[in-house]
Amino acid sequence: MAMAGLYRRLLPSPPAVDFASSQGKQLFLEAVQNGTMESFYRLVSYFQTQSEPAFCGLASLSMVLNALAIDPGRKWKGPWRWFDESMLDCCEPLDKIKARGISFGKLVCLAHCAGAKVEAFHASHSSIDHFRKYVMKCSTSDDCHVISSYHREALKQTGTGHFSPIGGYHAGKDMALILDVARFKYPPHWIPLTHLWEGMNYVDESTGKTRGFMLISRPHREPGMLYTLSCKHESWNSIAKFLIDDIPFLLTSEDVKDICKVLSVIVTSLPSNFEEFIKWVAEIRRGEDGSPSLSVEEKARLSVKEEILKQVQRTGLFKHVASFLSHSCSGHTPTSGDRDTFPVIAASVCCQGAEILGGKISSSAEYCCRETCMKCWKAEDDKPIRMVCGTVVNGNTEQGVDVLIPSSCGKLSCTCSSTTKSIRKHPASTDVLTVLLLSLPTSTWAGIADEKLLSEIHDLVSIENLPALLQEEVLHLRRQLHILKRCQEGKVDEDLGVPLS
């Protein structure tokens, strides 16, 4: 019985020149001599094949992020933190990308959320000279890379829209080296820049916008260490809208006279599942037999997370939030049920950890955490370390998962009573809500009529008043929120040049 299938495609030449051909090798040698292949070496070290037919954008981005040595802040498999297509799910659910690919603007969104510095241009708002300038810039350096979004038809290739990184440039021939991530289809190849530019001028039917190119480089600061925004839950659209649009309106329409009233207006209106939108990032690894031990790197990361948690709990805003949320003060809580209790959090994180360590693009609902236990021990520097150890079951398989928990010890006195309450040791709703409020745009509070209260609010949320680590966390979340709101409005493909501050 016959079986249908394809084994690669013949590269149309011209216009392309196969990188491995004698002519392709000669172009490479000449470009190396002219200094326009500097980006090639790091990129080719992390060259990968897209794992799904529609994952060209994700493969291109993960390849570039790894080439730039940007730390994803979470593990891929085993002990390794590494960008993989399955981890790029901040701006669009993976199942949707798998079904229909990703737009240029949403790939830009993903690059921002992954912690990269991004400059992006639609072809309709650029020029071939502008494009050539940036290709030359990145080809003579190894600290920035270009990803091109183009239509294959302009290159006389089969297929439609495609993403791939540019691995170098030959100035004399005006040709770019395409490191095609669809390696099952076409090999790396040189292509005249004019043809590539033509391909970028095709309109993407899903957005009505032309394709384009983006420059990706390392940021001056690393992405969020402890907190991040997530669009995995289907409610993220409504939550982003609430945070950016509804809160300013509520503060304008309500007669707020003090901080407690401001918090009341916000907390009582919060969507019930807002905690699905902002998460604290747990460090996971495969379960170990015997006495647990931490690498120097794991200790350093845990120490930074704990310092950020302490800095959150030292802010004036945290004290107001904790006081408001305490039962004797308000009776309001932004969580529902027992989802904020430590056993529930531990079981949930273990299931997510097993999913990530298994490298599967699926739902952690398929995993069941059979048991968890807490291990506490002292490191060599006599510092206490807490780890949740869980056994997760998926079908007939079991996976041991260890979760490092950042902790912060302290006491908090409630301003409405004489009682003193212990602060929970793991990141909890009070911390998360505080960070979320700090991350709102500065314009959020502009509608407060009481000038004295407005001044007090500004002092509490001012980025300048925060310590350095927390300042970086808050700025990262502000960028994420701004980008996700643009995604929610469908504007991410329209205003690529809008600042993200």
Curated annotation (Swiss-Prot):
<feature type="active site">
    <location>
        <position position="180"/>
    </location>
</feature>
<dbReference type="GO" id="GO:0098849">
    <property type="term" value="P:cellular detoxification of cadmium ion"/>
</dbReference>
<feature type="active site">
    <location>
        <position position="162"/>
    </location>
</feature>
<dbReference type="GO" id="GO:0046938">
    <property type="term" value="P:phytochelatin biosynthetic process"/>
</dbReference>
<keyword id="KW-0808">Transferase</keyword>
<feature type="domain" description="Peptidase C83">
    <location>
        <begin position="1"/>
        <end position="221"/>
    </location>
</feature>
<dbReference type="InterPro" id="IPR038156">
    <property type="entry name" value="PCS_N_sf"/>
</dbReference>
<keyword id="KW-0862">Zinc</keyword>
<protein>
    <recommendedName>
        <fullName>Glutathione gamma-glutamylcysteinyltransferase 1</fullName>
        <ecNumber>2.3.2.15</ecNumber>
    </recommendedName>
</protein>
<dbReference type="InterPro" id="IPR015407">
    <property type="entry name" value="Phytochelatin_synthase_C"/>
</dbReference>
<keyword id="KW-0012">Acyltransferase</keyword>
<dbReference type="InterPro" id="IPR040409">
    <property type="entry name" value="PCS-like"/>
</dbReference>
<comment type="similarity">
    <text>Belongs to the phytochelatin synthase family.</text>
</comment>
<dbReference type="InterPro" id="IPR038765">
    <property type="entry name" value="Papain-like_cys_pep_sf"/>
</dbReference>
<dbReference type="GO" id="GO:0046872">
    <property type="term" value="F:metal ion binding"/>
</dbReference>
<keyword id="KW-0479">Metal-binding</keyword>
<keyword id="KW-0408">Iron</keyword>
<dbReference type="Pfam" id="PF05023">
    <property type="entry name" value="Phytochelatin"/>
</dbReference>
<keyword id="KW-0104">Cadmium</keyword>
<feature type="active site">
    <location>
        <position position="56"/>
    </location>
</feature>
<dbReference type="Pfam" id="PF09328">
    <property type="entry name" value="Phytochelatin_C"/>
</dbReference>
<dbReference type="InterPro" id="IPR007719">
    <property type="entry name" value="PCS_N"/>
</dbReference>
<dbReference type="GO" id="GO:0016756">
    <property type="term" value="F:glutathione gamma-glutamylcysteinyltransferase activity"/>
</dbReference>
<dbReference type="GO" id="GO:0010273">
    <property type="term" value="P:detoxification of copper ion"/>
</dbReference>
<keyword id="KW-0186">Copper</keyword>
<comment type="function">
    <text>Involved in the synthesis of phytochelatins (PC) and homophytochelatins (hPC), the heavy-metal-binding peptides of plants.</text>
</comment>
